[in-house]
Structure formats: C-alpha cells, structure tokens
C-alpha cells in the first residue's frame, strides 16, 4: 500500500506549479530519423510532445519514410536545471517497403526514459537524451508479376534520441 501511495504522490506532485509551465520548440535526432518537435511542460512533472519528420529503415538507411507521433512525459526527478522522466510514445509510421512502388503504414507504441538538462540563463535552451523500446510489425502483400507473396516489416526496437530545444514560459 505504501508503494502505491508513493507512486500516486510522485505522479501528481507539482501539477499546479506555474514556474515550469513551458513550451519548447526544437529538433530531435534518433537512430533512424530526424524530426522537428514541440514539447509542452504543463507543470514541473507532466509534459507532452508532438513530433513528425523523415525516417529510414534499418535495411536501407534512405530517408524516404515519414513518421508522426506524440509522447506523454512524467518527471520522476526534477531539479532547477534538469529533469529525469519516463514516457509513453505513440507514433504512426508510413514506410516505403520496396522503393516507391509498395507502401504501408503501421502504429508503433513504445516506452522511454529520458534526462533533460536546460539553462534558464541563456534563452532557456534544453538538451535531452532518451532511451527506450518500441514495437511495430506489419505484414503486407507484394505483387510480383503473377505471384502474390507476404512480407513482414519490423520496426527497429531501440529508441535512442538526442534533442535540442528553445523554451519559453507560457
């Protein structure tokens, strides 16, 4: 019972704080994508992020795919100059599986943990590192002249993001 009470306390501490209601505009580089994003901290401990951009596949590394999505972030440790948080990720990926001839799309859920450092003194710049796991598998049909075969696309499971943001108070 103590663990549940502690978890509830951690989830809701600081939800009414005005001091850290911030919005950040920035960019994110990951293993297979580059995305502009908007991160909104509604309190010291709760945030949301919306992103979208170009992506690639593990097999070809060509930036010919697209992805859009969101993150729900919950800080587990907060200091004046950094945050440690966990998050839930949901994204939709549009994939060119055989060049431009065959396309498919799939939802990809994930979880992550991140650390963000920021400076209030110099235009509120922020830098974050995120590490996590995502899962997405899609089976699709491929038409080859007279034959139709089934292929499977699997999303790369590792989330490794580096992000840079410019924050301002809301």
Question: What is the meaning of each model-derived region?
Answer:
Residues 153-170:
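Outer-membrane beta-barrel "beta-signal"
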Residues 22, 32-34, 53-59, 77-79, ...:
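Sequence/structural signature of outer-membrane beta-barrel proteins
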Residues 17-63, 165-170:
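Short glycine/proline- and aromatic-enriched beta-strand/turn motifs that initiate or cap beta-hairpins
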Residues 3-14:
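Sec-dependent N-terminal signal peptides
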Residues 1-4, 20:
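Positively charged n-region of N-terminal signal peptides that target proteins for export
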Residues 22, 31-33, 65-69, 106-112, ...:
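Transmembrane beta-barrel architecture of outer-membrane proteins
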Residues 39-127:
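Gram-negative (and chloroplast) outer-membrane scaffold detector with strong preference
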């Amino acid at each position: 019972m103590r663990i549940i009470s502690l978890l509830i306390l951690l989830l809701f501490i600081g939800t009414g704080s005005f001091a850290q209601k911030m919005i950040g505009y920035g960019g994110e580089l990951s293993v297979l994508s580059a995305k502009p994003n908007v991160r909104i901290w509604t309190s010291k401990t709760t945030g949301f992020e919306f992103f979208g951009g170009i992506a690639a596949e593990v097999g070809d590394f060509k930036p010919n795919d697209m992805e859009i999505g969101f993150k729900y972030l919950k800080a587990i440790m907060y200091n004046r100059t950094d945050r440690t948080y966990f998050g839930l990720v949901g994204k939709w990926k549009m994939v060119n599986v055989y060049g431009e001839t065959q396309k498919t799309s799939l939802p990809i859920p994930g979880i992550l943990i991140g650390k963000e450092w920021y400076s209030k003194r110099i235009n509120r710049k922020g830098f974050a590192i995120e590490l996590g796991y995502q899962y997405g598998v899609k089976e699709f049909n491929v038409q080859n002249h007279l034959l139709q075969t089934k292929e499977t696309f699997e999303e790369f499971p590792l989330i490794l993001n580096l992000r840079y943001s410019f924050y301002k108070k809301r």
